[in-house]
Amino acid sequence: MIDEGEEVTEETLNSDIQKLKEKQDMLDKEISQLIAEGYRVIELEQHISLLHEYNDIKDVSQMLLGKLAVTRGVTTKELYPDFDLNPND
């Protein structure tokens, strides 16, 4: 995926699209496996909905951290300790 400061080119966008397609295929296989194991579709839909909400919140948080980092003249990762964030999350 494109990182801060990385130049956006058609090649990097195509690479990101391919990675996302591969991730979608992997997730579709996992869903099929869970259904085969007896999980109900409604449970999976609720779980997926919660994951989307989590990812949206995380995306907004990263954007805000980025803006704060620019304001303070530091990198985003340098802000992680200030907010007790794990850099591996």
Swiss-Prot record:
What gene is this protein a product of? Answer: Swi5
**Functional summary from the UniProt entry:** Component of the SWI5-SFR1 complex, a complex required for double-strand break repair via homologous recombination.
Name the domain of life: Eukaryota
Cysteine disulfide links: none
Q: Where in the cell is it found?
A: Nucleus
Annotated Pfam families? Swi5 (PF07061)
Family stated for the protein in its record: Belongs to the SWI5/SAE3 family.
* Signal peptide interval: none
Keyword match rRNA-binding: no
Q: What is this protein called?
A: DNA repair protein SWI5 homolog
DNA damage recorded as keyword: yes
Alphabetic keyword roster: Coiled coil, DNA damage, DNA repair, Nucleus
**Where in this chain does the entry annotate a coiled-coil region?**
7-37
